[in-house]
């Protein structure tokens, strides 16, 4: 899905697997021994912890550190990854100083979907929720999950729907529904539907 064109020493040029899923982004260097700080795209970063290697894709221009940035896609072996406050920190094999870590700033992290561990009961990967239709208990359609976001202790569904303006013009709007048991009744991945205790005028 895209090969690397150049990379600093120690980074292995690669390409993304067909089932690659973006799971996080490198925020910055952490410490002076090559560690990086990561913002995971999930409140449960178990997929990151279970993988022995990660695919990194070069950051978009606005996220580039301005120096030593690689291009394309590289594959790095993970020596260690662990939680740190509300982020994840990780150390890659062969990346042993702060300069090496800073060269990765802004990089997008991908993993093959097939490598994800099986989610526990009532736990879901964000990628499996995006695109699901959302209805309330009365069967009223509320829209489709476009994205998710994290707000402290829980995730929030970003549900896109079509609204009518006063002049009758249809516009795309968005409603935010907390992904917590108080509002989420059922999640049917196979049926592509989430049932919620929510009203259209909330």
Swiss-Prot record:
Gene Ontology BP, a term: ribosomal small subunit biogenesis
Pfam families: PRC_RimM, RimM
Species of origin: Polaromonas sp. (strain JS666 / ATCC BAA-500)
Domain notes per entry: The PRC barrel domain binds ribosomal protein uS19.
GO terms for MF: ribosome binding
Assigned keywords, A-Z: Chaperone, Cytoplasm, Ribosome biogenesis, rRNA processing
GO CC, alphabetical: cytoplasm; ribosome
The protein's name in its UniProt record: Ribosome maturation factor RimM
Assembly: Binds ribosomal protein uS19.
Function of the protein: An accessory protein needed during the final step in the assembly of 30S ribosomal subunit, possibly for assembly of the head region. Essential for efficient processing of 16S rRNA. May be needed both before and after RbfA during the maturation of 16S rRNA. It has affinity for free ribosomal 30S subunits but not for 70S ribosomes.
InterPro entries: PRC_barrel-like_sf, PRC_RimM, RimM, RimM_N, RimM_N_sf, Transl_B-barrel_sf
Annotated ranges, domain PRC barrel: 121-202
Gene3D superfamilies in alphabetical order: PRC-barrel domain (2.30.30.240), RimM (2.40.30.60)
Family from the record: Belongs to the RimM family.
Keyword Transmembrane: no
Superkingdom assignment: Bacteria
Compartments where found: Cytoplasm
